[in-house]
Protein backbone atom coordinates (compact mmCIF):
# COMPACT_ATOMS: atom_id res chain seq x y z
CA UNK A 1 0.00 0.00 0.00
CA UNK A 2 2.70 2.48 1.09
CA UNK A 3 4.83 1.47 -1.89
CA UNK A 4 1.95 2.39 -4.21
CA UNK A 5 1.53 5.79 -2.52
CA UNK A 6 5.26 6.54 -2.84
CA UNK A 7 5.23 5.51 -6.50
CA UNK A 8 2.31 7.84 -7.21
CA UNK A 9 4.01 10.69 -5.30
CA UNK A 10 7.22 10.11 -7.26
CA UNK A 11 5.33 10.17 -10.55
CA UNK A 12 3.56 13.39 -9.54
CA UNK A 13 6.87 15.05 -8.59
CA UNK A 14 8.45 14.00 -11.88
CA UNK A 15 5.45 15.41 -13.74
CA UNK A 16 5.76 18.72 -11.84
CA UNK A 17 9.49 18.86 -12.69
CA UNK A 18 8.86 18.20 -16.38
CA UNK A 19 6.07 20.81 -16.47
CA UNK A 20 8.26 23.46 -14.80
CA UNK A 21 11.19 22.56 -17.07
CA UNK A 22 9.11 23.32 -20.17
CA UNK A 23 7.02 26.09 -18.58
CA UNK A 24 5.96 28.92 -20.88
CA UNK A 25 4.13 32.22 -20.55
CA UNK A 26 0.87 32.27 -22.52
CA UNK A 27 -1.77 34.96 -22.29
CA UNK A 28 -5.29 35.04 -23.68
CA UNK A 29 -4.47 37.61 -26.35
CA UNK A 30 -1.86 35.23 -27.83
CA UNK A 31 -4.54 32.83 -29.05
CA UNK A 32 -4.67 34.76 -32.33
CA UNK A 33 -0.97 34.01 -32.84
CA UNK A 34 -1.12 30.24 -32.25
CA UNK A 35 0.12 29.31 -35.78
CA UNK A 36 3.32 31.32 -35.13
CA UNK A 37 3.85 29.91 -31.65
CA UNK A 38 6.42 27.17 -30.95
CA UNK A 39 6.34 25.14 -27.76
CA UNK A 40 9.37 25.51 -25.52
CA UNK A 41 9.54 21.73 -25.30
CA UNK A 42 9.93 21.47 -29.09
CA UNK A 43 12.70 24.10 -29.12
CA UNK A 44 14.42 22.53 -26.12
CA UNK A 45 14.55 19.16 -27.87
CA UNK A 46 15.53 20.69 -31.21
CA UNK A 47 18.61 22.32 -29.64
CA UNK A 48 19.45 19.30 -27.44
CA UNK A 49 18.55 21.27 -24.34
CA UNK A 50 20.32 24.42 -25.58
CA UNK A 51 23.55 22.50 -25.33
CA UNK A 52 26.79 24.44 -25.72
CA UNK A 53 27.70 22.29 -28.73
CA UNK A 54 24.63 23.75 -30.50
CA UNK A 55 25.61 27.37 -29.75
CA UNK A 56 25.92 29.10 -33.12
CA UNK A 57 26.68 32.67 -32.12
CA UNK A 58 26.25 35.46 -29.59
CA UNK A 59 24.76 38.93 -29.96
CA UNK A 60 24.68 41.92 -27.64
CA UNK A 61 21.22 40.98 -26.32
CA UNK A 62 21.19 37.21 -26.63
CA UNK A 63 22.52 33.91 -27.92
CA UNK A 64 21.77 31.92 -31.07
CA UNK A 65 21.47 28.12 -31.21
CA UNK A 66 21.11 25.81 -34.16
CA UNK A 67 18.49 23.09 -33.95
CA UNK A 68 16.52 20.45 -35.79
CA UNK A 69 12.77 20.03 -35.36
CA UNK A 70 11.03 16.65 -35.32
CA UNK A 71 10.17 17.32 -38.98
CA UNK A 72 13.96 17.45 -39.68
CA UNK A 73 13.70 21.15 -40.56
CA UNK A 74 16.84 23.03 -39.49
CA UNK A 75 16.27 26.18 -37.48
CA UNK A 76 18.11 28.90 -35.58
CA UNK A 77 16.78 29.91 -32.15
CA UNK A 78 17.62 33.29 -30.64
CA UNK A 79 17.21 33.55 -26.88
CA UNK A 80 16.62 37.15 -25.84
CA UNK A 81 16.22 38.54 -22.32
CA UNK A 82 13.16 40.69 -21.69
CA UNK A 83 12.57 43.19 -18.94
CA UNK A 84 9.36 44.18 -17.21
CA UNK A 85 9.24 47.60 -18.92
CA UNK A 86 8.79 46.21 -22.41
CA UNK A 87 5.39 46.10 -24.08
CA UNK A 88 5.23 42.36 -24.73
CA UNK A 89 1.94 42.50 -26.62
CA UNK A 90 3.34 45.06 -29.08
CA UNK A 91 6.57 43.09 -29.38
CA UNK A 92 4.78 39.83 -30.24
CA UNK A 93 2.52 41.57 -32.78
CA UNK A 94 5.67 42.97 -34.44
CA UNK A 95 7.21 39.50 -34.60
CA UNK A 96 4.09 37.98 -36.14
CA UNK A 97 3.83 40.84 -38.65
CA UNK A 98 7.47 40.47 -39.71
CA UNK A 99 6.98 36.71 -40.00
CA UNK A 100 4.37 37.28 -42.72
CA UNK A 101 6.88 39.02 -45.00
CA UNK A 102 8.27 36.82 -47.77
CA UNK A 103 11.34 37.47 -49.91
CA UNK A 104 14.09 35.12 -51.08
CA UNK A 105 16.76 37.42 -49.63
CA UNK A 106 15.17 37.83 -46.19
CA UNK A 107 15.93 35.50 -43.31
CA UNK A 108 12.52 33.97 -42.66
CA UNK A 109 11.22 34.53 -39.13
CA UNK A 110 9.20 31.38 -38.46
CA UNK A 111 7.73 32.16 -35.06
CA UNK A 112 8.37 32.63 -31.37
CA UNK A 113 8.04 31.23 -27.87
CA UNK A 114 7.76 33.13 -24.60
CA UNK A 115 8.93 32.30 -21.11
CA UNK A 116 9.21 34.42 -17.99
CA UNK A 117 11.78 37.13 -18.74
CA UNK A 118 12.74 35.53 -22.02
CA UNK A 119 11.74 35.59 -25.67
CA UNK A 120 12.77 32.92 -28.17
CA UNK A 121 12.74 33.77 -31.88
CA UNK A 122 12.80 30.96 -34.45
CA UNK A 123 14.39 31.48 -37.88
CA UNK A 124 15.54 29.55 -40.91
CA UNK A 125 19.04 28.23 -40.27
CA UNK A 126 21.83 29.97 -42.22
CA UNK A 127 24.84 27.60 -42.22
CA UNK A 128 27.52 30.11 -43.19
CA UNK A 129 26.73 32.61 -40.46
CA UNK A 130 27.00 36.36 -40.92
CA UNK A 131 28.82 38.45 -43.47
CA UNK A 132 31.06 40.47 -41.16
CA UNK A 133 32.84 37.25 -40.22
CA UNK A 134 33.87 36.85 -43.88
CA UNK A 135 34.72 40.50 -44.49
CA UNK A 136 36.63 41.27 -41.31
CA UNK A 137 37.94 37.92 -40.02
CA UNK A 138 41.14 36.99 -41.84
CA UNK A 139 40.83 33.39 -40.65
CA UNK A 140 37.70 32.90 -42.77
CA UNK A 141 37.93 32.14 -46.51
CA UNK A 142 37.91 35.23 -48.71
CA UNK A 143 34.77 35.97 -50.72
CA UNK A 144 35.45 36.56 -54.40
CA UNK A 145 34.22 39.76 -56.03
CA UNK A 146 31.53 37.88 -57.97
CA UNK A 147 30.26 36.38 -54.70
CA UNK A 148 30.27 39.79 -53.00
CA UNK A 149 28.47 41.46 -55.89
CA UNK A 150 25.83 38.71 -55.94
CA UNK A 151 25.30 39.04 -52.17
CA UNK A 152 24.99 42.83 -52.18
CA UNK A 153 22.44 42.77 -55.02
CA UNK A 154 20.34 40.28 -53.06
CA UNK A 155 20.47 42.41 -49.90
CA UNK A 156 19.50 45.53 -51.88
CA UNK A 157 16.52 43.66 -53.32
CA UNK A 158 15.40 42.59 -49.83
CA UNK A 159 15.69 46.13 -48.44
CA UNK A 160 13.70 47.51 -51.37
CA UNK A 161 11.00 44.90 -50.68
CA UNK A 162 10.77 46.03 -47.03
CA UNK A 163 10.43 49.67 -48.04
CA UNK A 164 7.70 48.74 -50.53
CA UNK A 165 5.85 47.02 -47.65
CA UNK A 166 6.22 50.24 -45.58
CA UNK A 167 8.65 48.49 -43.23
CA UNK A 168 11.88 50.09 -41.99
CA UNK A 169 14.81 47.84 -41.18
CA UNK A 170 16.60 50.27 -38.82
CA UNK A 171 19.79 48.22 -38.40
CA UNK A 172 21.33 47.41 -41.79
CA UNK A 173 24.89 46.18 -41.21
CA UNK A 174 27.22 43.33 -42.15
CA UNK A 175 26.37 41.39 -38.98
CA UNK A 176 22.72 41.34 -40.08
CA UNK A 177 23.49 39.84 -43.48
CA UNK A 178 23.47 36.05 -43.21
CA UNK A 179 24.62 33.55 -45.82
CA UNK A 180 22.64 30.46 -46.77
CA UNK A 181 24.00 27.15 -48.11
CA UNK A 182 24.40 28.66 -51.60
CA UNK A 183 26.09 31.84 -50.30
CA UNK A 184 23.05 33.96 -51.06
CA UNK A 185 22.84 37.07 -48.90
CA UNK A 186 19.82 37.09 -46.56
CA UNK A 187 18.93 40.25 -44.67
CA UNK A 188 18.23 39.55 -41.00
CA UNK A 189 16.43 41.93 -38.64
CA UNK A 190 18.81 41.59 -35.71
CA UNK A 191 17.35 42.42 -32.33
CA UNK A 192 16.99 46.20 -32.63
CA UNK A 193 14.03 45.78 -35.02
CA UNK A 194 11.93 44.22 -32.25
CA UNK A 195 12.68 46.82 -29.61
CA UNK A 196 14.84 44.45 -27.54
CA UNK A 197 17.73 46.87 -27.97
CA UNK A 198 17.39 49.38 -25.12
CA UNK A 199 19.69 51.90 -26.85
CA UNK A 200 17.50 54.91 -27.74
CA UNK A 201 19.61 55.52 -30.87
CA UNK A 202 18.25 52.81 -33.16
CA UNK A 203 20.89 51.07 -35.23
CA UNK A 204 24.58 50.37 -34.73
CA UNK A 205 27.43 52.85 -34.35
CA UNK A 206 29.16 53.33 -37.68
CA UNK A 207 26.00 52.63 -39.66
CA UNK A 208 23.68 55.25 -38.14
CA UNK A 209 22.73 58.15 -40.41
CA UNK A 210 23.82 61.53 -38.99
CA UNK A 211 20.27 62.94 -38.86
CA UNK A 212 19.12 59.92 -36.84
CA UNK A 213 21.58 60.82 -34.10
CA UNK A 214 19.81 64.17 -33.77
CA UNK A 215 16.16 63.30 -34.42
CA UNK A 216 15.98 59.65 -33.33
CA UNK A 217 13.42 59.15 -36.12
CA UNK A 218 14.16 56.21 -38.46
CA UNK A 219 13.37 56.70 -42.15
CA UNK A 220 13.92 54.92 -45.47
CA UNK A 221 16.76 57.36 -46.19
CA UNK A 222 18.43 56.38 -42.89
CA UNK A 223 18.28 52.75 -44.08
CA UNK A 224 19.85 53.87 -47.38
CA UNK A 225 22.70 55.53 -45.47
CA UNK A 226 23.41 52.28 -43.62
CA UNK A 227 23.29 50.38 -46.90
CA UNK A 228 25.84 52.84 -48.33
CA UNK A 229 28.18 52.05 -45.44
CA UNK A 230 27.68 48.35 -46.20
CA UNK A 231 28.51 48.89 -49.89
CA UNK A 232 31.82 50.54 -48.98
CA UNK A 233 32.65 47.68 -46.62
CA UNK A 234 31.90 45.13 -49.36
CA UNK A 235 34.33 46.79 -51.75
CA UNK A 236 37.04 47.75 -49.25
CA UNK A 237 36.95 44.75 -46.91
CA UNK A 238 37.27 47.14 -43.96
CA UNK A 239 34.91 48.38 -41.29
CA UNK A 240 33.15 51.67 -41.98
CA UNK A 241 34.62 53.12 -38.78
CA UNK A 242 38.03 51.91 -37.57
CA UNK A 243 39.76 52.53 -34.23
CA UNK A 244 42.62 53.38 -34.18
CA UNK A 245 43.51 54.55 -37.68
CA UNK A 246 45.29 57.21 -39.62
CA UNK A 247 43.23 60.43 -39.91
CA UNK A 248 42.32 59.83 -43.57
CA UNK A 249 41.45 56.21 -42.79
CA UNK A 250 39.27 56.94 -39.74
CA UNK A 251 36.14 56.71 -41.87
CA UNK A 252 35.77 54.77 -45.13
CA UNK A 253 34.13 57.80 -46.73
CA UNK A 254 37.35 59.79 -46.20
CA UNK A 255 39.53 56.89 -47.33
CA UNK A 256 37.60 56.24 -50.56
CA UNK A 257 37.43 59.96 -51.42
CA UNK A 258 41.20 60.32 -50.87
CA UNK A 259 41.86 57.45 -53.28
CA UNK A 260 39.43 58.97 -55.77
CA UNK A 261 41.08 62.41 -55.61
CA UNK A 262 44.45 60.77 -56.30
CA UNK A 263 42.96 59.28 -59.47
CA UNK A 264 43.00 55.75 -58.08
CA UNK A 265 39.46 55.02 -56.86
CA UNK A 266 39.91 51.26 -57.39
CA UNK A 267 42.92 51.46 -55.06
CA UNK A 268 40.45 51.60 -52.16
CA UNK A 269 39.38 47.99 -52.88
CA UNK A 270 40.01 45.05 -50.58
CA UNK A 271 43.62 43.94 -51.19
CA UNK A 272 42.54 40.31 -50.74
CA UNK A 273 40.68 40.53 -54.05
CA UNK A 274 44.05 40.86 -55.80
CA UNK A 275 43.19 40.79 -59.53
CA UNK A 276 39.87 38.99 -59.06
CA UNK A 277 37.42 41.82 -59.72
CA UNK A 278 35.63 43.75 -62.44
CA UNK A 279 36.99 47.31 -62.44
CA UNK A 280 33.74 48.98 -63.59
CA UNK A 281 31.70 47.11 -60.94
CA UNK A 282 34.12 48.06 -58.13
CA UNK A 283 34.04 51.72 -59.19
CA UNK A 284 30.26 51.71 -59.42
CA UNK A 285 29.85 50.11 -55.96
CA UNK A 286 32.29 52.58 -54.36
CA UNK A 287 30.59 55.60 -55.94
CA UNK A 288 27.14 54.25 -55.09
CA UNK A 289 28.26 53.72 -51.49
CA UNK A 290 29.29 57.39 -51.30
CA UNK A 291 26.04 58.46 -52.95
CA UNK A 292 23.98 56.51 -50.39
CA UNK A 293 26.05 57.75 -47.45
CA UNK A 294 25.67 61.44 -48.26
CA UNK A 295 25.26 63.76 -45.30
CA UNK A 296 21.97 65.25 -46.53
CA UNK A 297 19.21 62.58 -46.54
CA UNK A 298 17.31 64.28 -49.39
CA UNK A 299 20.32 63.78 -51.68
CA UNK A 300 20.46 60.01 -51.14
CA UNK A 301 18.86 57.74 -53.74
CA UNK A 302 15.86 55.56 -52.96
CA UNK A 303 16.36 51.78 -52.70
CA UNK A 304 14.50 51.47 -56.00
CA UNK A 305 17.18 53.62 -57.65
CA UNK A 306 19.93 51.68 -55.85
CA UNK A 307 18.65 48.36 -57.21
CA UNK A 308 18.48 49.81 -60.73
CA UNK A 309 22.10 50.99 -60.48
CA UNK A 310 23.29 47.60 -59.20
CA UNK A 311 21.38 45.68 -61.87
CA UNK A 312 22.76 47.92 -64.63
CA UNK A 313 19.34 49.32 -65.52
CA UNK A 314 20.45 52.88 -64.82
CA UNK A 315 23.73 54.83 -64.82
CA UNK A 316 25.08 56.68 -61.79
CA UNK A 317 24.96 60.49 -62.04
CA UNK A 318 28.24 62.22 -62.82
CA UNK A 319 29.91 63.52 -59.67
CA UNK A 320 33.48 64.49 -58.67
CA UNK A 321 34.91 63.31 -55.31
CA UNK A 322 34.58 66.82 -53.85
CA UNK A 323 30.83 67.02 -54.57
CA UNK A 324 29.20 68.87 -51.62
CA UNK A 325 27.87 66.36 -49.13
CA UNK A 326 29.71 63.38 -50.65
CA UNK A 327 33.02 63.62 -48.82
CA UNK A 328 31.64 64.54 -45.38
CA UNK A 329 32.30 61.71 -42.91
CA UNK A 330 29.84 61.34 -40.05
CA UNK A 331 31.41 62.85 -36.89
CA UNK A 332 31.13 59.75 -34.68
CA UNK A 333 34.23 60.79 -32.74
CA UNK A 334 32.19 63.75 -31.44
CA UNK A 335 29.12 61.62 -30.73
CA UNK A 336 31.12 59.02 -28.80
CA UNK A 337 33.32 61.49 -26.90
Swiss-Prot record:
Reaction(s) this enzyme catalyzes, per UniProt: L-seryl-[protein] + ATP = O-phospho-L-seryl-[protein] + ADP + H(+); L-threonyl-[protein] + ATP = O-phospho-L-threonyl-[protein] + ADP + H(+)
Keywords: ATP-binding, Kinase, Nucleotide-binding, Phosphoprotein, Serine/threonine-protein kinase, Transferase
Gene Ontology molecular function terms on file: ATP binding; protein serine kinase activity; protein serine/threonine kinase activity
GO biological process terms, semicolon-separated: response to other organism
Enzyme class: transferase
Domain Protein kinase residue range list: 50-316
Ribonucleoprotein is among the record's keywords: no
Active site: 171
UniProt EC number: 2.7.11.1
Protein name stated in the entry: Receptor like protein kinase S.3
Positions of modified residues (Phosphotyrosine): 123
PANTHER family, per the entry: PTHR27007
S-S pairs: none
Residues the record lists as binding ATP: 56-64, 78
Pfam families hit by this protein: PK_Tyr_Ser-Thr
